[in-house]
Amino acid sequence: MDRLRRFPEQGVTDRAALDALLDSQWVGVLSCVVDGRPLAVPMLYARDGDRLLLHGSTGAGALRGVAAGASAVLTVFALDALVVAPTTFESSVNYRSATVRGPLETLDDDERGAALDTFSEVLVPGRTGEVRAPNRKELAATLALSLPIRADGWLLKVADDWPATPEEADAEDDVWSGLVPVRTVLDAPVPAPWAAALPVPPSVQGLTRSDGA
């Protein structure tokens, strides 16, 4: 596992904490160097056990580069709170961030369909049972990659602190300070115009129920 050199106390070595962050987010930034040019592409991902699944068009430059063997790193970030301190200098944010690096494996035809089903089930559990399976043309246009979560290939950083005290910040003690929690919620689904008369399927209902809506 990689190690933090600055603020090492924020480094977390618990694999369960890494999985919790990865499972709580949907978007990461895939970074690599292709033909001497740095690329950073925000994209959806899904954790499947000890690997992360990525997919996109076979025409995507960044994915073609990593599929050809370029080293890559996926960064995932969750903003948990604004830290409002007695001074602007001491104000910050609480967050969790992870990097997972390593070689990406291009999934073959036999694995691609199953991986895409897994990807869909992570994002919208139950949806694959409500729609048709991808056809041969769609699968041929899709590049599916797997990034292993190796013991020596990930880093997790967690900032979870109260603001500095007035004494620590050299500030007056009559200035409010505290935390403003940040969270992502799933609102009520909005049907497409051509589906307005159709019932909301169980998979979509489950998304809002699990979010507390």
Protein language model features and the residues they cover:
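Well-ordered beta-strand positions
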Residues: 44-46, 67, 138, 148
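An N-terminal domain-cap segment
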Residues: 1-54, 64
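A generic structural signal for short beta-strands and their flanking turns/coil linkers
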Residues: 26, 41, 48-50, 68-72, ...
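C-terminal edge-of-domain segments
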Residues: 111-213
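General beta-strand recognition
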Residues: 51-53, 73, 155
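Short, structured beta-strand-loop surface elements
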Residues: 59-118
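Short helix-to-loop capping/linker segments positioned immediately adjacent to catalytic or ligand/cofactor-binding
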Residues: 29, 33, 86, 104-107, ...
